[in-house]
Amino acid sequence: MSVIELTDVVKRYQNGEEVIAALDHVDFQADRGEMVTIIGPSGSGKSTMLNMIGLLDTPTEGTVHLDGRNVTDFTEDELTEERRSGIGFVFQDFHLLPMLTATENVELPSMWDTSVDRHDRAQDLLQRVGLGDRLNHRPDQLSGGQRQRVAIARALINEPDILLADEPTGNLDQDTGETILTELTRLKEDENVAIVAVTHDEQMLEYTDSTVRLVDGVVTEVSGR
Amino acid sequence: MSVVDFLWRFPSVQMAWRNLGRNKLRTVLAALGIIIGVVSICSLGMATAAIQQQATSQLGSIGNEVSITSGQDSDTDGVTDDQVDTMRNLVTDAEVVPQKTNSTTVSSRNGREVRVSVTGVTNAAALYNLTSGEAPTRLLSGALLSNSTATTLGIEEGDPVEYDGQLYRVQGLIEEENAFGFGGGELVLPESALSEQNHYNVVTIVAADSATATEIGGELDEYFNTEDEEELSINTFGNAGQVGGFLETLSLALLAIGGISLVVASVAILNVMLMSTVERRGEIGVLRAVGIRRSEVLRMILTEAALMGALGGLIGVLLSLAAGLVIFQMITGDPLGALQWSGFQYLVYGFGFAVVASILSGIYPAWKAANDRPVDALRG
């Protein structure tokens, strides 16, 4: 069973008089232990699609299933709970909080859960992404690649089923980008997590299990399945 | 576990503290507004407390008295013997002291003259304190003279004073503790010295405290007077009377002025919180995206505002305490008066107001940030 599944999803935006369909009858699915890449030119609806998969946005039409449950009509608070327990995010420009150390940034998603102590897991994750000697550094003391690895560790802290990455290599040089992709490939197996990445970086296609090509809100090609 | 570790168990406090530390100048400026507000509320409040304390201590000597004179509907030109007897029957728990009054000129041997009021009274002890020794409870011969008059005229204890062709030996000097003065000096003589006056000008009833005095005043008013006819005019100074009312108005006015500065300060906090949440919009979007609940974002930002208020409030209270010590030293001569509840309460109120005003100012920015859709907020 797919961990996340979009069925016939349409997302329309009102732009003045004009109605724009950012996604036009899109189907999508991803399984645990699989990396799916959504690729397409800018403005093709990649980010909108990632927002649907990440339960940050709701579709105008169609349904979203998470782990077999229909979450299409969930309220904002219910969606928050789902994101909290099952989804990890990696953003293009990392989005680490500048006043927190690497460890604290990794702990952030579970910070308000005083019932669990995630401190050890946070340090363990940082060690696994090769930042064992940077635990108490602040983001401004880390390089771009290191920051992205902190962001990946943060996305994994809640033991998610899905890890979403929006242009994970977008702000990194070629070599660092490759290191990050190798890291992600390793983690999807270790953590048995579905990785959905959005990119226009063709380099990513070497690492991915399947690719969804998106043009003007329409899926034009699905490969690798 | 240290206090810091303990506080760190509250994620809202931890996050709020870190956020405040990010832009220290802005935090300090916002807190400065609160500090000024708290200091103005506290020091104005403590100043009125000091004035009130000083005034009550001075009013204390008449606060427990009932003063009775002839009413406007009375047939006689004073209070009669019969009426005094009735009062003595009615009032069992206080001293009834009838007095006859007049005025005269006292002269000294060196020819200097002073106009004084004359009081003929038997129970002088109930009304007067002497510079040394006790005033007699039955003044049958001799006289008492105010200390200042005696000094002016060079009269000492034992010297004679003339009134109405008779000489009276000065038995004691009256200590003038009353700051409100009642004008010049006073000569106190036995009641018999004013025997040509048939009625008493004033009857003073000295009770244990101002509450009892007020009660007695009401009782006598009910007995002697009706709604249309005032046989006796009965005055009490209980509850510090009109002076107290004036001070209350004054203190309210001063607190209102202090309150305005706190309102200004909370508008500054509103502005700072709004700016900082707008600046951090993307960041709050990340928090929401990774599953931080709306209520948790709300709590974090409200805690920021509360911390800022508490910080400003604390510094403000410390400065106000210092100001209070100075104010009390200047007005009452006792700096430690600032630590009594009547003055100290303003520090508690000041701190409370600072925190409450800051939280109120934080509500809108916090609500706005928490309810921003994460997908919109992430775009920054």
What are these model-predicted stretches?
Chain A
Residues G62-D73, G224:
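Conserved ABC transporter NBD signature motif
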Residues I20, V71-G88:
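ABC ATPase NBD coupling module
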Residues R138-Q148:
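Conserved ABC ATPase signature
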Residues I152:
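Hydrophobic anchor residue at the start of the ABC signature
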Residues L163-D166:
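Catalytic Walker B motif of ABC-type/P-loop ATPase nucleotide-binding domains
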Residues E159:
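Conserved catalytic motifs of ABC-family nucleotide-binding domains
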Residues L100-L108:
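Short coil-to-helix segment of the ABC ATPase nucleotide-binding domain corresponding to the Q-loop/switch region
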